[in-house]
């Protein structure tokens, strides 16, 4: 089971109470995890809750599962494409929206090494970080701006579908076969691959598939 952390407080905790009681009624031994993408090598502030459970008859204690973590040794810029199509750069309207004082105040940081949570329905596909770059070419390391829209370069751009997938742990071998908007939604709704891999490895080590 996977969900956002806020689910635990939904309806003053009653929703989670019902769900957990159902797990118990189905005779499962289970454990609740709160896992951050940054603890698994992905530079994105994305925390999700997971429930790992086994039928009581299997005799497996979920508390014995050890999830392998990975030190964060990369930054957002390491996940960006070198060459980006012009269509991903915002026009004047988008540029003014993300650089206005009110929008900037909502952003946690500038030149951040970790991206904010990728959402499926975010306007302008904003990753939450702004980087000041003096490069006079159209090749930018991230969403960048120089302070004013000049219609040629120094404008802000959104993350590409490939960059969003990378920030979710997908390798470039993953084929993009749907339009950009659908890909943004799929990436935002996905589970970080690195986290899921660690969970699966932990489950396999319990020997559950040998029983």
Residue ranges, per PLM feature:
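Class I S-adenosyl-L-methionine
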Residues: 1-125, 132-138
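C-terminal target-recognition/interaction regions appended to catalytic cores
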Residues: 88-211
């Amino acid at each position: 089971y996977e969900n956002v952390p806020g689910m635990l407080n939904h309806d003053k905790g009653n929703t989670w109470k019902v769900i957990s009681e159902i797990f118990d009624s189905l005779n499962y031994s289970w454990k609740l995890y709160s896992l951050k993408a940054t603890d698994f090598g992905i530079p994105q502030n994305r925390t999700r809750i997971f429930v790992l459970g086994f039928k009581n008859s299997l005799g497996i204690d979920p508390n014995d599962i050890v999830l392998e973590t990975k030190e964060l040794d990369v930054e957002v810029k390491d996940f960006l494409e070198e060459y980006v199509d012009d269509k991903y750069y915002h026009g004047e309207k988008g540029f003014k929206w993300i650089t206005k004082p009110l929008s900037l105040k909502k952003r946690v940081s500038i030149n951040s090494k970790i991206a904010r949570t990728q959402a499926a329905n975010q306007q302008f596909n904003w990753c939450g970080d702004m980087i000041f770059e003096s490069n006079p070419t159209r090749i930018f390391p991230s969403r960048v701006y120089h302070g004013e829209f000049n219609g040629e370069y120094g404008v802000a751009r959104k993350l590409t579908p490939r960059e969003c997938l990378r920030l979710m742990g997908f390798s470039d071998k993953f084929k993009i076969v749907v339009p950009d908007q659908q890909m943004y939604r799929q990436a935002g709704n996905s589970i970080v691959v690195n986290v899921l891999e660690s969970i699966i490895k932990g489950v396999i080590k319990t020997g559950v598939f040998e029983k």
